[in-house]
């Protein structure tokens, strides 16, 4: 794995961990003046499954953003399900999983993966909750099993972004934000709104410039 990619994952890990560590709940226990003992006890889930998209793109960020909150919360068993691509796991995704201490990894994806971690198989024990984004089929499967397992309140759909910018906005950054969502899939919806014609023209030029540097330009252009 490229050392720059490793370094980026390491930096992202510590930044995300720092943020979520500030969110950690604390147990509460006190006795009021009537001698009543009142408590609030924080009990983390026993197990969660991270669904990490695969196919033609890789998302080590999905590993970090879903695993780290579970780590901070104290979840004991964190597993990863990832379909990979043509039978291979992406090195960056595997490195992110290693960074998060995840050793239980299954190369499966789609609705069958959701079913496996919900109800269990001969080799996979069921979990308490599924987190992480997927395509339309994965989202449909999550909604279908929602009565039997914990799932996010809003399942993921096609990527969308709406940016409102003005003359003070950086065209390079705006273009990067648009492309960052557009490259996810063919159904992504990316919109830029601005009253400044000059900015719009600069962003268009910047988009074409940046598309030449990414491997998923054909997807982003759609």
Annotate the PLM regions.
Residues 1-46:
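N-terminal Rossmann-like NAD(P)+-binding subdomain of aldehyde/semialdehyde dehydrogenases
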Residues 2-16, 41, 56, 63, ...:
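Generic structural signal for well-ordered, non-membrane alpha-helical segments
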Residues 30-95:
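Conserved small-residue-rich beta-alpha loop and adjacent elements
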Residues 77-79, 162, 191:
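A structural signal for isolated positions on well-ordered beta-strands in alpha/beta enzyme cores
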Residues 97-99:
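Conserved nucleotide-cofactor-binding alpha/beta core module
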Residues 101-189:
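Conserved NAD(P)+-binding/catalytic subdomain of aldehyde/semialdehyde dehydrogenases
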Residues 187-222:
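NAD(P)-dependent aldehyde/semialdehyde dehydrogenase
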